[in-house]
């Protein structure tokens, strides 16, 4: 009897590690389909870098006196960002803008004047000259991908449409140098070629304080740009 009990106990001890190993390797994986839920993951997951080139128009005190074609100037941008959910993301973007317009030649050194008179606008009471200057705008935006927020949450969708709002800091690099808080808003459209590459089209408006172009007026200033 004692010998049988000993053999039974020995068999039980031998089987214990096998049961422990089996239970220790069992893994349960859950996938969330909640498009509003923020998942904790690696910092680099769902991050992106974007580059853009296009055109912009500045809205200053006298710029409307210049034809549209003469006000159109180059715009460049670079951004880094991250999508926390399929519908909500953030980015930090820098825009380099060349601005063209008009300034009033009533002081010894008109703001950003090229010295060239605006045809038909350089007579008595106007004294307008063409102007141009370079500026930068660094801003942080919150983006909302409406096709995922209000759609069927299809992560394989080729198209994304993301309105955004943000705040930043704009600075004119040419004398007279000026700076301003910038309010940024716009619409970003994307076509996803594959999981790595996408083509973007970004229509962006910027609200700026009066005087950034070197002239004080009665209202705020702004910029409208399109890059892709």
PLM regions and their residue ranges:
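Gram-negative (and chloroplast) outer-membrane scaffold detector with strong preference
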Residues: 86-181
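Extracellular loop and loop/strand-boundary signature of outer-membrane beta-barrel proteins
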Residues: 37, 61-66, 123-131, 171-175, ...
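Bacterial Sec-dependent N-terminal signal peptides
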Residues: 1-27
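Residues on the lipid-exposed face of transmembrane beta-strands in outer-membrane beta-barrel proteins
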Residues: 51-55, 78-82, 92, 140-146, ...
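Short glycine/proline- and aromatic-enriched beta-strand/turn motifs that initiate or cap beta-hairpins
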Residues: 21-81, 174
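Residues that define the transmembrane beta-barrel architecture of outer-membrane proteins
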Residues: 45, 68-76, 134-138, 157-159, ...
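Short loop/turn motifs that connect adjacent beta-strands in outer-membrane beta-barrel proteins
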Residues: 36-46, 87, 148-160, 193-196
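Predominantly the C-terminal beta-signal and adjacent terminal strand-loop region
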Residues: 99-105, 196-228
């Amino acid at each position: 009897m004692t010998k049988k009990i000993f053999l039974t106990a020995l068999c039980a001890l031998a089987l214990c590690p096998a049961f422990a190993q089996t239970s220790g390797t069992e893994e349960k994986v859950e996938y969330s389909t909640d498009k509003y839920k923020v998942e904790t993951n690696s910092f680099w997951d769902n991050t992106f870098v974007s580059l853009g080139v296009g055109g912009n128009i500045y809205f200053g005190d006298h710029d409307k006196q210049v034809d549209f074609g003469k006000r159109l100037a180059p715009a460049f941008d670079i951004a880094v960002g991250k999508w926390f959910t399929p519908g909500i993301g953030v980015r930090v973007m820098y825009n380099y803008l060349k601005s063209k317009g008009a300034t009033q030649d009533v002081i010894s050194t008109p703001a950003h004047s090229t010295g060239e008179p605006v045809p038909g606008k350089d007579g008595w009471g106007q004294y307008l000259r063409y102007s141009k200057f370079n500026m930068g705008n660094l801003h942080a935006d919150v983006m909302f991908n409406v096709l995922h927020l209000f759609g069927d949450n299809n992560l394989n969708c080729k198209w994304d449409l993301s309105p955004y709002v943000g705040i930043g800091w704009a600075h004119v690099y040419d004398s007279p140098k000026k700076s301003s808080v910038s309010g940024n808003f716009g619409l970003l459209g994307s076509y996803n070629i594959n999981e790595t590459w996408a083509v973007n089209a970004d229509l962006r408006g910027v609200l700026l304080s009066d005087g950034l172009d070197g002239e004080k007026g009665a209202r705020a200033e702004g910029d409208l740009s399109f890059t892709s």
